[in-house]
Amino acid sequence: MTTTHPTPPIEFSADISQITDRFQTTTKPLSESFLADLNIICQSSNDLADRVKHSRDWWPLAMHWSLNAQTARRADVICRPTTTKHISDIVALCSNNSVPITVSGGRSGVCGAAIPLFGGVVIDMTSLAGVISVDEISGLVEVLPGTFGPDLENDLREKHGLSVGHFPQSFDISTVGGWIGSRGAGQFSTRYGKIDDMVAGLEVVLADGSVILTGTEPAGAAGPSLTSLFIGSEGSLGIISKVWLRAHPIAPAERRAAYMFGSFADAVEAMRLAIRSGATPAVLRLYDERESKRAHGGDGTQCALLVLDEGENILIDAMMKVVDNECIANNAQSEDVALVEHWMNHRNDTSGLQALSKKGFVIDTMEVAVCWSKVNQVAETVKKSIMTVTGARSASCHISHSYIDGACIYFTFVAEPTSNTLEAIEISYEAIWNAAQNSALDTGANLSHHHGVGINRAKFIKRALGPAHDVLAAIKHALDPNDILNPGKLGFASSRGEIKTKK
């Protein structure tokens, strides 16, 4: 699938006119004069179908709501700016009228971050798209935030021989702004880094409509990094209106390898030693016994490790040699590289999510980052915790991203609720998430590696960050005193009232 537009997660079980809101929040109706002023600034729409479409993302729980003729919360109006000036004017107008704003791009997030909890204005950023300029000497790309992954990469590769190297599972249906807002990671991150490492600078519209540039230099020491402040802020501190990304020459060569280990711990040790020796292949993915059997050639007792690197031949040879040495030293057997080919061909497939949801199963994923010394404990503890929940049918994991000091563990779980009612589904979903996230935090993992917080994880963030969350909340209040930017997210208390769910 290659698209350059948002892709709906799942169909509704009823006509759009019959859809109701799951979240019940109180907001004042938008006045006719406000809507008229908005339409003067840029194209806007309060068409019902438009409002429903732009108020969704890929949060798995919300898919069950869709199958029960509900959406999370509809926006009141959709705006489609095409310039920074448009965004600035929209924000200033909303600030003066205390109207909440939620930014929308590809709407591929899985935690509900793009859902407008308090209605108001949704700004559709997908008309603000395209590569503006490329500094080929420095490898610096100026791009608009509504640009979809395929459009960015195709432009850079075909016209400039460059690649950003950011390939998340949502690559085909997500945008540059979304990558930054959620602090995402691509599947080649062990070589190229997370989106944090790729962003050189940002243009940001603040909550009063003013516009700032955070800088585009390769490094700096003029106080804390303002660029970093907005990466991962999920549209709650400012609206990203322009981006400068670091790009690399297209890799001239590629190499692949696959291994099977008799134990997850042996494979983790091989990965750790390879990474700490300086080997950073673009892809280094380890699957536990269950996931290896399901999709990667294992027999139920083996763990598959898939390796792919790209770049100059001399560098690839060195990287792959280090990885091979550590794998063999830790009791691995070499496998057919066709396993890597299979993964490459199916890595972005999400069809199982929709299929199982339609059958009434609860299915979701949870990713956390953890130091090497705790990887095995976190992996085992979280899976065991999930399986203690009533109705849990499967808990598995893989390591998807690696660093000098640790890795990302990506869990997948499936549960069968006690009945196919929405109430039973929600009880099952919440129970598994509580078990999984709390056990991860208990054993030393963080809250999230790259999916972000949104609505789903908001209840855990204060525990995860501790007093540091108060600092984050103080920044939010300083930048957005009227609480208009994506209110109710990142665990921030909203001045707009209580968030209730329809029963």
What spans do the regions from the language model cover?
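N-terminal flexible segment immediately upstream of the FAD-binding catalytic core
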Residues: M1-A92, G109-S138, E289-G298, L339-I363, ...
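C-terminal substrate-recognition/cap domain of FAD-linked oxidoreductases
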Residues: P8-P9, N46-W65, P249, R255-S263, ...
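Alpha-helix capping/hinge segments and adjacent helical runs
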Residues: I40, S44, L48, L441-V453, ...
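Short, ordered loop/turn segments at secondary-structure junctions
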Residues: G105-S108, Q169, L286-E289, G452
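FAD-binding subdomain of flavoenzyme oxidoreductases
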Residues: G130-R285, I484-L485, K500-K503
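Activity-critical C-terminal alpha-helical subdomain
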Residues: S210, G454-K503
